[in-house]
UniProtKB/Swiss-Prot annotation:
One of its GO terms (cellular component) is cytosolic small ribosomal subunit. The gene is RPS15AB. Transmembrane segments: none annotated. Coiled coil: none annotated. GO terms for molecular function: structural constituent of ribosome. It comes from Arabidopsis thaliana. Gene3D superfamilies: 3.30.1370.30, 3.30.1490.10. Keywords: Mitochondrion, Ribonucleoprotein, Ribosomal protein. This is Small ribosomal subunit protein uS8mz. It is found in: Mitochondrion.
Length: 129
């Protein structure tokens, strides 16, 4: 049975936020995890992250900001069409004002707002709020 790298990393971030830590170290590294963290940084949920030695097992150091309440990766990839993204966000996120769903699309890994703008669907990786 393989490890769920993205799920483990996001759980580590949530646990560190709950304990009031300033930073957290994530191991091992994946490109999907880096893209997920990039979206979290763009939306202001984490301060910064640095990838150390990405060609080996590597690690990522994440500087936390204290804004993450919950962050989960879906262990099953759920397909979402471009016109169904709004319905999916209403079911998944607590309110419409905050929180983001991360979707892997043919245009790359995007948050749900950008996927709606580009009118592309894909598979849901996870969400954070």
């Amino acid at each position: 049975m393989g490890r769920r790298i993205l799920n483990d990393a996001l759980r580590t971030i949530v646990n560190a936020e709950k304990r009031g830590k300033a930073s957290v170290e994530l191991k091992p590294v994946s490109t999907v995890m880096s893209s997920f963290l990039k979206i979290m940084k763009e939306k202001g949920y984490i301060k910064n992250f640095q990838v150390h030695d990405p060609h080996r097992v590597g690690r990522i150091t994440v500087d936390l900001q204290g804004r993450v309440n919950d962050c989960k990766a879906l262990t099953y990839r759920q397909d979402v069409k471009a016109n169904e993204i709004g319905q999916y966000t209403e079911r998944t996120l607590p309110t419409r004002q905050w929180g983001y769903i991360v979707i892997t699309t043919p245009d790359g890994i995007l948050d749900h707002e950008e996927a709606i703008k580009r009118n592309v669907g894909g598979q849901v990786l996870g969400f954070f709020h």
